[in-house]
């Protein structure tokens, strides 16, 4: 693991060479490949040092980080073609990747918090530096202040634990459980609820997605939302007693919110906004599963987090490919694309069906496990879950049918073929999504 961290460190100077764009991208994929070979199915921590280590939860998310960051460079070819500060762009992506890897491999709660917050900086720069509309400033402010305000109580909670326990090591804290600490429970959990994002504190997400460039959207949907889930997975060993008492609040809000957000999806005309709201709906069900604190819930939420990272990121790539051709993200213009880009319709279909958890995607495995855990927690949730599953399929079909079928927009006079780069990009999103269900132990068996 240390060799990978050093490799990443030595990639920083490369980002300032003249023609290093594709070399850095190849090196990121090489990193992912080396990391895959290093898979050791250990359910205890594989230490690098006192502060850093890996277990199976971190492993999948770090691999996803490498993968998505490589694909981000592949998707942002326009930055390379128009020489739009491409060296700074590469530097930002590498900095973000470095922060994410350190976040997922932190063994100390404070180090985790530090890198968790630091990953916000390059994301903000991506949105402000390479976004499209002037409103990106407002989106950046939303992103920053939602996350920072929610994270302050977390910092205070961490210092309280340090004062109380004299240690912040995750492994030592595993042996302890806080009882009747309602304020501590709230302060430790709230930052992650905002990052997930939970319904009611989700307003920063659609804004950030709509204003971000394609790379910003990919990393936001792919990895940064998963930081919230990862933090909750790590924290809940401490908070089981309070969790049993109060989790039903968040589960209720998430499930009802998921249904409402699914209805909002059906009213969207902006491609990116629709995919962003669908992320909130998916994260609602992930959060509910996590908060049941059952075996199925934890493993299912992990599987759906990995699946959603690949699927959402792929959909944002598709929306961007259409945007580059049409010059608009509106569904009123992006219609009848089956006539315009026939080759891409297959990818639209595959990723939309992945988004509604059709077999054989990993989403299916995650969603079935989550349904299992949430229904076993309470029978009443079946009503909400039925609506959620139905509307999830409805907005995925709406996105596909509206964008691909129907009459083509009359302002378009030519056909457009995709490039090999775009097909490879979509293939590298879709293939792991469907292949991972064959190796589902990777997602389901990390918890003994």
Swiss-Prot record:
A GO cellular component annotated for this chain's UniProt record is: mitochondrial membrane
Membrane-spanning residues where? 22-42, 56-76, 89-109, 110-130, 141-161, 183-203, 213-233, 246-266, 273-293, 298-318, 331-351, 374-394, 423-443
Task: Report which gene this protein is encoded by.
Answer: ND4
How does this protein lie in the membrane? Multi-pass membrane protein
Q: Which GO terms of the molecular function aspect are on file?
A: NADH dehydrogenase (ubiquinone) activity; ubiquinone binding
Subcellular location(s) per record: Mitochondrion membrane
Q: What does this protein do?
A: Core subunit of the mitochondrial membrane respiratory chain NADH dehydrogenase (Complex I) that is believed to belong to the minimal assembly required for catalysis. Complex I functions in the transfer of electrons from NADH to the respiratory chain. The immediate electron acceptor for the enzyme is believed to be ubiquinone.
One GO BP: ATP synthesis coupled electron transport
Family indicated by similarity: Belongs to the complex I subunit 4 family.
Q: Which InterPro entries match?
A: NADH4_N (IPR000260), NADH_UbQ_OxRdtase (IPR003918), ND/Mrp_TM (IPR001750)
Which keywords annotate this record? Electron transport, Membrane, Mitochondrion, NAD, Respiratory chain, Translocase, Transmembrane, Transmembrane helix, Transport, Ubiquinone
EC number(s): the record gives 7.1.1.2
Q: What is this protein called?
A: NADH-ubiquinone oxidoreductase chain 4
Alphabetical list of Pfam families matching this protein: Oxidored_q5_N (PF01059), Proton_antipo_M (PF00361)
Top-level taxon: Eukaryota
Q: Which organism is it from?
A: Anopheles quadrimaculatus
Enumerate the catalysed reactions.
a ubiquinone + NADH + 5 H(+)(in) = a ubiquinol + NAD(+) + 4 H(+)(out)
